[in-house]
């Protein structure tokens, strides 16, 4: 930057940068020499009049102008008059180009402030660890102790609180907890301690549940390896019963067949209470009026409740004949789905086996209608024989509520009716002569097939029955997704 000769440059911005006071009249009207005014370099390199920059040759540049003694003294006096006395103005000092020992512009930024340090130093960590080791029984410093530690470690209160919260969490993960978690009034610790309490209450129960092979937390390999009948006859754990209450409405339905009602003499289950005991007893006493002749089973009757009975109540899961029946004990949805998904292979292997061979649960609407048809049919003993029960065991979705039956699937989903899901039309009368032809557009193919199955027990081993069972995992998953 160059200015014309004789121009007095007043760098207010530059002086403000270095926190210098404003010009005084003595400086502006102070003694100036003609040489300084005429100097081309004086105005360019010296931001204020009378600077000592050119008193002697400086290392930054070589001045062609040498001041005499009097102008130099006057310039030094003028320079110190407004810059201040703490600076030593030697004759060879470059006033404007030298590096000043102070940095006023950086004063507003807390670069050296320990409160803004991100990581704790080793000394601070050692101090906090020492306090923690002394208070392992109660590693919750009070407000006063936090303030004391913050002063000692030059950290903020928030940093101290966070350090102790992390230290407690770290000790808990390493199973070195020697204290009882408690709630604190501090906001930063309240949620963490509540979580710790919940985890401590749950942890003692987890080993017990895992130790019980029948519990829902048991390994999936053990349950899948066991056969369907053996896996379902054992008594459930209390944890299994807790899931019954929420899942029983749509998942654990009692198939309304007489063969199932004969199973009320099975072994009672032990465990928590269940509201379905009276309903199961009512089913045993009065099975017939719920489904009149000629009508399919539309869904569960209000009293035809859920599979899980009350404490000491009879189990509705086992059929009377010696061969163990496949039925679903009250299990969480996960195990029911896993069992049904792996059971279609069992059907293919044991399709021509003995009469009591396990068969996977069939879709709810079809099974319910088939059972309804069996009640209305004049065949002598289709529903009492174990072979009649095999294609329709007490699955998790047997006799689903009304909104799971066929009219609702094409109406509210993209899957059409059940006839498209099953491979071929079943034998039987025409589409208008089925027992449930009045039931609001129910798929007649399904009704006819169910009626034919109920009237002819020999057809239970046919391909139609295998198709019904084979499609069950798909429809079960479809039904579960709507719950």
From Swiss-Prot:
This protein's GO CC annotations: chromatin; nucleus
Q: Impact of mutating residue 150 to P? A: In HMMS; hypomorphic mutation
Q: Where is the composition biased (Acidic residues)?
A: 186-203
According to the record, the segments passing through the membrane are none
Compositionally biased spans, kind Basic and acidic residues: 204-213, 250-261
UniProt induction comment: Down-regulated by 1,25-dihydroxyvitamin D3 in prostate cancer samples from patients assigned to receive weekly high-dose 1,25-dihydroxyvitamin D3 before radical prostatectomy. Also down-regulated by 1,25-dihydroxyvitamin D3 in the human androgen-sensitive prostate cancer cell line LNCaP and in the estrogen-sensitive breast cancer cell line MCF-7.
Molecular function terms, GO-annotated: DNA-binding transcription factor activity, RNA polymerase II-specific; DNA-binding transcription factor binding; identical protein binding; RNA polymerase II cis-regulatory region sequence-specific DNA binding; sequence-specific double-stranded DNA binding; vitamin D binding
Q: Recite the UniProt keywords alphabetically.
A: Disease variant, DNA-binding, Homeobox, Intellectual disability, Nucleus, Phosphoprotein, Sensory transduction, Transcription, Vision, Vitamin D
On this chain, the residues bearing Phosphoserine are 274, 464
DNA-binding feature ranges: 113-175
Any one GO BP annotation for this protein = visual perception
Q: What is its main location?
A: nucleus
Extract the ranges annotated as region (Disordered): 177-392, 423-442
SMART domains, from UniProt?
HOX, IRO
Q: Where is the composition biased (Low complexity)?
A: 266-282, 374-388
What does the UniProt entry say about where the protein is found? Nucleus
Instruction: Report the sequence similarity comment from the record.
Output: Belongs to the TALE/IRO homeobox family.
Per the UniProt record, the associated disease is:
Hamamy syndrome: A syndrome characterized by severe hypertelorism, upslanting palpebral fissures, brachycephaly, abnormal ears, sloping shoulders, enamel hypoplasia, and osteopenia with repeated fractures. Additional features include myopia, mild to moderate sensorineural hearing loss, gonadal anomalies and borderline intelligence.
Primary role = Establishes the cardiac repolarization gradient by its repressive actions on the KCND2 potassium-channel gene. Required for retinal cone bipolar cell differentiation. May regulate contrast adaptation in the retina and control specific aspects of visual function in circuits of the mammalian retina. Could be involved in the regulation of both the cell cycle and apoptosis in prostate cancer cells. Involved in craniofacial and gonadal development. Modulates the migration of progenitor cell populations in branchial arches and gonads by repressing CXCL12.
Under which name does UniProt file this protein? Iroquois-class homeodomain protein IRX-5
């Amino acid at each position: 930057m160059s200015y014309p000769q004789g121009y007095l440059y007043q760098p207010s911005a530059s002086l403000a940068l270095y926190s210098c006071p404003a010009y005084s009249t003595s400086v502006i009207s102070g003694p100036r020499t003609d040489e300084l005014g005429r100097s081309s370099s004086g105005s360019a390199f010296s931001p204020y009049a009378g600077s000592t920059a050119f008193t002697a040759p400086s290392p930054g540049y070589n001045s062609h102008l040498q001041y005499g003694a009097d102008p130099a003294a006057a310039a030094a006096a003028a320079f110190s008059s407004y810059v201040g006395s703490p600076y030593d103005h030697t004759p060879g000092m470059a006033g404007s180009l030298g590096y000043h020992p102070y940095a006023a512009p950086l004063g507003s930024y807390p670069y050296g402030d320990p409160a803004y340090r991100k990581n704790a130093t080793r000394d601070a960590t050692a101090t906090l660890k020492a306090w923690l080791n002394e208070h392992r029984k109660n590693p919750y410093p009070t407000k006063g102790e936090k303030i004391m530690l913050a002063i000692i470690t030059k950290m903020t209160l928030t940093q101290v609180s966070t350090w102790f919260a992390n230290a407690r969490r770290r000790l808990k993960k390493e199973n070195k907890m020697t204290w009882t978690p408690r709630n604190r009034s501090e906001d930063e610790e309240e949620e963490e301690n509540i979580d710790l309490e919940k985890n401590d209450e749950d942890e003692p129960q987890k080993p017990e549940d895992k130790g019980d092979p029948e519990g829902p937390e048991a390994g999936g390999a053990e349950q899948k390896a066991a056969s369907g009948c053996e896996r379902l006859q054992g008594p459930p754990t209390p944890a299994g019963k807790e899931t019954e209450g929420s899942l029983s409405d749509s998942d654990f339905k009692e198939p309304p067949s007489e063969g199932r009602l004969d199973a009320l003499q099975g072994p009672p289950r032990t465990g928590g209470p269940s509201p379905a005991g009276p309903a199961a007893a009512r089913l045993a006493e009065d099975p017939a009026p719920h489904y009149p002749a000629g009508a399919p089973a539309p869904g569960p009757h209000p009293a035809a409740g859920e599979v899980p009975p009350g404490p000491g109540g009879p189990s509705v899961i086992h059929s009377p004949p010696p061969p163990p029946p496949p039925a679903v004990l009250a299990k969480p949805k996960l195990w029911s789905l896993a069992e049904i998904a792996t059971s279609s292979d069992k059907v293919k292997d044991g399709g021509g086996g003995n009469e009591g061979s396990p068969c996977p649960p069939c879709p709810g609407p079809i099974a319910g209608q088939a059972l309804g048809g069996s009640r209305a049919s004049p065949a002598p003993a289709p529903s009492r024989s174990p072979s009649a029960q095999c294609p329709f065991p007490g699955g998790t979705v047997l006799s689903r509520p009304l909104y799971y039956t066929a009219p609702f699937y094409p109406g509210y989903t993209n899957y059409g009716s059940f006839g498209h899901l099953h491979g071929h039309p079943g034998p039987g009368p025409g589409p208008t002569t089925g027992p449930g032809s009045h039931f609001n557009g129910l798929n007649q193919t399904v009704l006819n097939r169910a009626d034919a199955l109920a009237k002819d027990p020999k057809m239970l081993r046919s391909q139609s029955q295998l198709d019904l069972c084979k499609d069950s995992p798909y429809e079960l998953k479809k039904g579960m997704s709507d719950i």
